[in-house]
Amino acid sequence: MKHFILFLFLFSYFQASSQSERKLFVYGGQVTKGFIKYTAKLTGKKKPKICFLPTANADDIYYINYWHKLCAGLNVEAHVLRVWISSRYQKKSFEEILMKMDAIIVGGGNTLNMLAIWKAQEIDLALKKAYDKGIVLAGGSAGSLCWFKAGTTDSRPKKLSIIKGLEFLNYSHCPHYHSEKTRRPLYFKNILNETLSDGYACDDKSGILFLNNRFSKSVSLNAKSFSYYVYKKDGKVVEEKLKTEIIK
C-alpha cells in the first residue's frame, strides 16, 4: 500500500511538472513595438516565431504591412495567419501553423466578426490547444477582449455593447478604458447590474500579464497609462488602479 501511495504521489507530481505554464498578455490598444518586444521576452526564446492574426481587421494589407514594419529590427521571426484563403494555395491547416509558433498576437478591429470566423474555421479550438501547450497568447483591443468571458465592444451598429469572448480568462474586460469616453461608464453600469462579472480594464498603452489564468502583473509603455481591477462591493463599483511596471 505504501508503494502504491508513493507511486500516485510521484505520478501526480511529474504530471503537474510536465504541464506548460500558460501565459496570456493583454493590452488596451493597438499593437506596438514595445508590446511585441515584451511578448517576445515572455517566450524565453532568443528569436521567437510570432504569428500575427489580423482577422478582426479583415486581413487588411496595410495592417499586415504595419505589423512587419513594427517587427523590423526586432529579434523575432514574424508570421501572419490570414483567414481569407483558398485551399488551392494554402496546404497547411490553421492549427498546424499556430502550433509551430512561440507566440501569437491578435490585432484590433471587429471582435464580433473575428470570433464568428474563428469559430467557423475552428481557429478558436486551435488557439486553446496552443495556449494549453504553453504558446504565449497576446493582443490588444479586439485582440485582448477575445480572451475574456465578456466585455465592452464597438462591433455592432449605433453604440457600444456587450460581447461574449472565448473565456480563456474567467473575468470581464474593457479595452480603451480612458481613450474612448463611453467605455468606462458602460463597464461600470454592467458590473453594477451584474451583466458583467469583476474584471480588468486597460488603457491603450497599458497591459496585464496573466499566468495560468490568474493576474500576475501590470505593465505600461509610459507613466500615464494604467490597468485596473473593477468589481462590485456593497452595491457599488470599486476601481483599483494596479501597480504598474514601465517597460521599454
Segments and roles (model prediction):
Residues 1-20:
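Bacterial Sec-dependent N-terminal signal peptides
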Residues 19-46, 61-66, 70-73, 103, ...:
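C-terminal and late-domain segments of enzyme folds
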Residues 30-32, 55-59, 85-87, 110-113, ...:
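Solvent-exposed loop/turn segments at secondary-structure junctions
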Residues 51-55, 173-174:
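Short internal beta-strands
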Residues 57-109, 113:
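Portal/gating segments that form or line small-molecule/metal binding sites
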Residues 97-100, 121-134:
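Catalytic-core regions built around general acid/base machinery
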Residues 105-108, 127-150:
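Catalytic nucleophile loop
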Residues 111-121:
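Glycine/threonine-rich flexible loop motifs
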